[in-house]
Amino acid sequence: MQPQDLDLNYGLLEDILKAFLQNEIRKFGFSSVVLGLSGGIDSAVVAELAVRALGPEHVLALKMPYKESSRESLEHADLMIRRLNIKAEERPVTPMADDFFRDVPEGERLRRGNIMARTRMVLLYDVSARDGSLVAGTSNKTELLLGYGTMFGDMASAVNPLGDLYKTQVRGLARHLGIPSILIDKAPSADLWEGQSDESDLGFSYGEVDLLLYMMLELRMEREAILGEGVSASFYDRVRKMVVRNQYKRLMPVIAKISGRTPGIDFRYARDWQEVR
Amino acid sequence: MQPQDLDLNYGLLEDILKAFLQNEIRKFGFSSVVLGLSGGIDSAVVAELAVRALGPEHVLALKMPYKESSRESLEHADLMIRRLNIKAEERPVTPMADDFFRDVPEGERLRRGNIMARTRMVLLYDVSARDGSLVAGTSNKTELLLGYGTMFGDMASAVNPLGDLYKTQVRGLARHLGIPSILIDKAPSADLWEGQSDESDLGFSYGEVDLLLYMMLELRMEREAILGEGVSASFYDRVRKMVVRNQYKRLMPVIAKISGRTPGIDFRYARDWQEVR
């Protein structure tokens, strides 16, 4: 298995994702999206797709730095804003985050990271209510499967064009879209503290884990067959456990079933239920 | 149709919900819950159930007042805390909420209400991470169906024992559990601003709408049959539209389907996937 095995027809993919954004946004009478533009590749790709799908006047980028956010991230976000000629607002999260942090010791990085991600969600959703727009999500499939994200934080959105694309495929799409290579080639980071990098956090590269997840999910290969491809047993077991343990992040809250029709269990209409039009 | 038609065997219901809490919490190695105790009937019932299911030492109540929260709400929350002999913490949301409110005009009550609900979610989830506990939800079925709640705010939880109970049934259960009648009989309020009441907000009573929802969902009665029960056409149409329009609040974010196995669409294991034990 090679990373190239995950490659997609990126021209066709661009068309599908543009149609997805147009359809899922306009069917409810909306015409615009707002997204958090972090300076990373995922949000850059979503911004690019949204502009191509809806037009630059219908895309608002929120820059939501914390006082410790890297200068580089903001510069890369500005690079995309100029490239796409879209409106942008800078809404620092420092005041709110620091209020929350008063009760959170400095070393509690995961708790602080979750608080920042959720503070950003509060801002994004308030701006979407202010403007009558929808929040575009930027979580990719690798993050969603590993649970490498914050519930009700960066994982919260109305429409997410990247949720079924491994990071490797987001990179391929980014190259196809002509996203500046400086954003594609730098080490991915959620920028939650200085020098933070996803891959050092996780202890493996996106390239490695994407191949493993692809073999597990898409190819449905058994453990022995995957180990036969040169994947170590410890890596396999660790990733499998991450996927299983984080299933709750991919589901609605558990509701105690009492009646014959329980929201989310057997009262499950599609989002665009027939009466809405 | 009479409100009594919605009545349940509340003794059996208590047993079912206690078993639900025990099972859904302990199966993942947790033993405790944290919940927002507002002084209202829903959170009082969840606190009571949690104590009976897990023991008072495993229930933490967070009181999260805003500077405009009613004194009465806090007193009623304290009433329950004494009754149940549980630990409690007061974490005012005023500093964080006011930071967010700087960009939100005074009159924008819905936006401010959503910000407060999400600020409380951030606190609840941080405390659950701090203590290694799960967040117990307090949204009832009437709220979930009408969309009368905040996504990623009060609707966010790990386990929700009330999600399949109409408000009428929560009241019945509250009486069975012996919840102080002062909490049962007062006008339900999310306490988002002074004098706020759900029923004046909604323009109808919980009793009326529960009967209508029950006929629509559980009894699957057609429009004409329901109007034949004395429900006005305008009330029927308005409630039906609320239920349909808020379906998105009961679903995970929409993900563009690209692969053969898309998180949430056809990669749908139960929350307690077999490997977790």
From Swiss-Prot, chains A, B:
It catalyses: deamido-NAD(+) + NH4(+) + ATP = AMP + diphosphate + NAD(+) + H(+). ATP binds at G36, L37, S38, G39, G40, I41, D42, S43, T138, K167, S189. The keyword Secreted does not apply. Mg(2+) binds at D42, E143. Deamido-NAD(+) binds at R118. One of its GO terms (biological process) is NAD biosynthetic process. Keywords: ATP-binding, Ligase, Magnesium, Metal-binding, NAD, Nucleotide-binding. Pathway: Cofactor biosynthesis; NAD(+) biosynthesis; NAD(+) from deamido-NAD(+) (ammonia route): step 1/1. InterPro entries: NAD/GMP_synthase, NAD_synthase, NH(3)-dep_NAD(+)_synth, Rossmann-like_a/b/a_fold. Catalyzes the ATP-dependent amidation of deamido-NAD to form NAD. Uses ammonia as a nitrogen source. Homodimer. This is NH(3)-dependent NAD(+) synthetase. The gene is nadE.
